[in-house]
Every structure is written in structure tokens, then in C-alpha cells.
Curated annotation (Swiss-Prot):
One of its GO terms (molecular function) is structural constituent of ribosome. This is Large ribosomal subunit protein bL36. Belongs to the bacterial ribosomal protein bL36 family. GO terms for biological process: translation. The gene is rpmJ. NCBIfam families: PRK00831.1, rpmJ_bact. The keyword Repeat does not apply. The keyword Ribonucleoprotein applies.
């Protein structure tokens, strides 16, 4: 999982990326390509 300041660039990398909020943190998850996971830090 990458930790990034801005998730906008991470979201446009793949069309299956979803933005999810968990415990006050913002995550990018991708079921088809799990390598795209990222967290805003």
C-alpha cells in the first residue's frame, strides 16, 4: 500500500479504483488490481 499526500492522481490510474473512508482515513481500493491500494497520509 502506498501512502500519498494526494489521492487524486492515484484514483485516475485505473477505472476500477474506489475512494473509501475508514476510521477517518481516505483509502483507494481496487478489487481487480490490488496493487493500486493507497492511503492518504
Amino acid at each position: 500500500m502506498k501512502i500519498r499526500n494526494s489521492l487524486k492522481s492515484a484514483k485516475v490510474r485505473d477505472k476500477d479504483c474506489r475512494v473509501v473512508r475508514r476510521r477517518g482515513r481516505v483509502y483507494i481500493i481496487n478489487k481487480k488490481n490490488p496493487r493500486m491500494k493507497a492511503r492518504q497520509g
